[in-house]
Amino acid sequence: MANSGFLKLAEERYSCRAFENKPVPDELIDKILEAARLAPSAVNRQPVKVWVARRPEVLEKLATTTKYLFDAPLVFVVGGNPSQAWVSRHDGKNRAETDACIAATHLMMEIQDLGLGSCWVGSFDAAAVKALFPEEMEGWDIIALFPTGYPAAGPSERHAVRKSMEEFAGEL
Ligand SMILES: Cc1cc2nc3c(=O)[nH]c(=O)nc-3n(C[C@H](O)[C@H](O)[C@H](O)COP(=O)(O)O)c2cc1C
């Protein structure tokens, strides 16, 4: 039986690295942001922020910080704020990045569910991004960029490569 629901969505999602030259409607952007806003976070601290970049002059500036925006018409920038996050007393770990990654995953999967494409981009100059928007990003670590739009390419070869279930999962 074919999968449905979330598993189907997870199967169908891939890193999209080419986009149509077509804007994403505001109501879809709102849904994507809502999916990210609803993400869980440690002790519900919600130390996460998402910025929307779609104005051509902003996209041009962002493109100086990474090779991986693929001329997308829209980029989500996800930040985590360590001063707002929960810190475990067991190991002293600050969970800002964990919380930001959960919200980022919600965002990425909602993009997929809306029939759009995106790519989680971790290879960018975070200091350069912050230098472009110093007031907005004061206190925030920049965790990921998501170039987003209507897909104009399918998955790369890497998409099909996953560990076997035997390697991936185990019983204790
Ligand atoms: C934390 C993280 C950082 C990534 N950074 C980049 C990146 O900078 N550039 C890029 O093209 N893809 C990036 N990717 C996408 C991965 O290469 C991709 O998810 C992986 O190869 C599996 O392919 P798939 O997403 O198509 O299934 C990143 C993914 C993750 C989760």
Name each region found by the language model.
Residues 1-172:
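Acidic, surface-exposed loops and disordered segments
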